[in-house]
Amino acid sequence: MKTVSVIIPAHNAAATIAGTLASLRSEAAVIGEVLLVDDASSDDTAAVAEEAASRLALPLRVIASNCRDAGGARNLALAQADCPWIYMIDADDLHLEGGLRSLLSRSDAQPRAEMVVGAFRRRTKGEHHQFKLPYGYTVTGIANASAYLEGQVRSIAVGSALVSRRAIGETRFPTALAYDEDTLFWARLMCRAPLAVITQPVMTYFVSAERSDDRFTIKPAQRFLAWRHALRQLTDCGIAKSTLKTREGLVALKIARVHYARGDFDTAARFLAVAKAAPKVPSDIWRCMRYQLKLAVRRRFSISHALLQSA
């Protein structure tokens, strides 16, 4: 029975989209539609996708958009999806054979579940890493959302989860954010969607560490404030403000680490101060202390080096 709408946002993905579609071929029996949102591409993304889908006998529909934003592109498709289940995957990732059917099977075994999360594998610089298994989730919505925001459970890669269209309802991805929009979307869904997990790997998630870090270096303060504004809107789901402050600290620490690694110690120090002020688990307290020490050492070294040069 064709019960799944597959949603793929794509921007200049001509080089990868055929591979992503090919990875879905084994799931054709349960796929009712593939909604490809061609988001302001300047290459042949749509044409390549249409040719591949025709060859693979996948029911592709291309939606043209000018969102220039992955969250906005997904939102367009969510508004047009027709099937009872939604599966989202990015245009440069790969689905693993049997993954989608396994997610559906778990939803049949646990009929109350409206969100099913599977394992995934990260691939960085051509190297496969260990499978990331979902852990720590409970049947309680707010507890799952809070633990997710606080980094106490495994994060969900887009492409490793199946969600009922009924549970999604009018929920949409926040737009115009440089990062973490998927976290806010999953957290909002978890508040009301009973969740189940499977340990079977569902997809391979391709990660560019450099591209991920670049998001934190462009207009870092402006982007952080925009993201924090979207984060704080989760209070309308019943999530505690202390949980949102913890998330602020986690993201601020990540930004501080990126700027430290790239030699921008002043920006690193500013974001480290935000992280230090947020509620933390012991491991994050230690990370903050470690980076404070490293910053102090590097700054002292820089001052000493400057004095030697001017002598």
Regions flagged by a language model, labelled:
Residues 86:
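Short aromatic/hydrophobic "clamp" motif used to bind/position activated sugar donors
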Residues 13-26:
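Short, well-formed alpha-helical segments that are part of the catalytic scaffolds
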Residues 65-81:
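Glycine-rich, basic loop-to-helix element that forms the pyrophosphate-binding segment
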Residues 23, 38-48, 67, 90, ...:
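A conserved acidic beta->alpha catalytic loop
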Residues 260-311:
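Membrane-interface aromatic/basic loop that binds lipid-linked glycans or pyrophosphate carriers
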Residues 100-167:
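Flexible acidic/His/Gly-enriched loops in nucleotide-sugar-dependent glycosyltransferase catalytic domains
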Residues 139-219:
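Conserved nucleotide-sugar donor-binding catalytic segment
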Residues 201-209, 214-242, 265-278:
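Catalytic core of nucleotide-sugar-dependent glycosyltransferases
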